[in-house]
Amino acid sequence: MEIIIVGAGIAGLSAGSGMVALRKGSIIDGTNMQVLIPDYYKDSESKWGLPMYAVHRVDLHTQLRLLATQKEGPGQPCDVQVRSKVVSYDAEGAKVTTENGEVLRADLIIAADGVHSTAVKQVLGDEVVQAGDTGWACMRWLVPSDDFLSDPQTAHMIQDSTTRYFTAAGGAAALVWYPCRNNEVQNFLYLSNFRARVEPSVPLEYAKKHFATALQTVVKKANQVKFWKLVARGPIPKWHKDRLVLIGDAAHPMLTFQGQGGGQAIEDGAALGILLDNVHDRGEIEERLQLFEQIRRNRGSALQILSNTNPPVPQSVRDAAAEYLPGHRLSSTDDVNEYVFSFDVLAESKAALAILQSKERITKSGFL
């Protein structure tokens, strides 16, 4: 079966390396440095089978691309085409048109080209709701660990394999700080309602409004700051039409507060990889895509809602996600973490496919 994947981000590829295992993590009141929830990732390996990891996004993307294009392993390697922006989709004909007018056809089109993907219009028609400004924006920057270790004011704040999540008064801002590249680099994500042009001095200007002096000293080291507004969209009623399927931010764009945008994109790719294995007839595609939505749409939709606020997630938000959580009651932050991290997309996909194939064998045998 020939497949066109539009988009070569996390959703379009899948897997990772260059990671740091997180032994612990805390949620901290950034105004007074009081620890609100210690050991936020405590016992993750014993509970969910794997340790928590922090990874530089560039390293993750590099490894995903390597995995997708290498000749070793099952399946055919992907042929990655750059500078081939897709401007239109045809769900029924399973084809896309690039900005230079080239028309590409396949058995299946996977739209993984982000929150502004025009494929959403093809799937939903007049039902489509465009992603909009959430009022939130973020700044990101990296600082070499040596810059902190060589400064007496910050050396004591470097903690191996620790993620820290600092909150501001009233939820007005959040600062996420975690190590990557074997603790050689410190990665920062600063979230608030920023609207100013970002210069190296801007993070500190905002930090003076939001955080304690000790944290301002950390933010002062920001350089080469990247800035973007955060857009999102609520859950949508379906993710596929004919031979076109949405994954990643095209299907379920979400805010960053649960740190699940990339994780959910990888789950999408993992599920499709299993469900589309050994499909030899176009007539099988629709049933496999229905199974994909059965496994992924409620979960992706619930996490869109749960990602709308800083952790710990309030009960009102947990209740709002209940529509997409049949059989689950999220009564606490621990329940949210259990829901996020205990799900095994590989096992769920294999089990669902086995049931489908069993039914197909029974039908072919003439017993039904």
Curated annotation (Swiss-Prot):
Binding site for FAD: A11, D249, G262
Keyword terms, alphabetized: FAD, Flavoprotein, Monooxygenase, Oxidoreductase, Virulence
Names of the cofactor(s): FAD
InterPro entries, alphabetized: FAD-bd, FAD-dep_Monooxygenase_BioMet, FAD/NAD-bd_sf
GO molecular function per UniProt: FAD binding; monooxygenase activity
EC primary class: oxidoreductase
One matching Pfam family: FAD_binding_3
Active-site residues from the entry: R140, Y178
Enzyme Commission (EC) number: 1.-.-.-
Known function: FAD-dependent monooxygenase; part of the gene cluster that mediates the biosynthesis of the phomopsins, a group of hexapeptide mycotoxins which infects lupins and causes lupinosis disease in livestock. The role of phomE within the phomopsins biosynthesis pathway has still to be determined. The pathway starts with the processing of the precursor phomA by several endopeptidases including kexin proteases as well as the cluster-specific S41 family peptidase phomP1 and the oligopeptidase phomG to produce 10 identical copies of the hexapeptide Tyr-Val-Ile-Pro-Ile-Asp.
Summary of subunit composition and partner proteins: Monomer.
Similarity remark: Belongs to the paxM FAD-dependent monooxygenase family.
Protein name stated in the entry: FAD-dependent monooxygenase phomE
Organism per entry: Diaporthe leptostromiformis (Lupinosis disease fungus)
Gene behind the chain: phomE
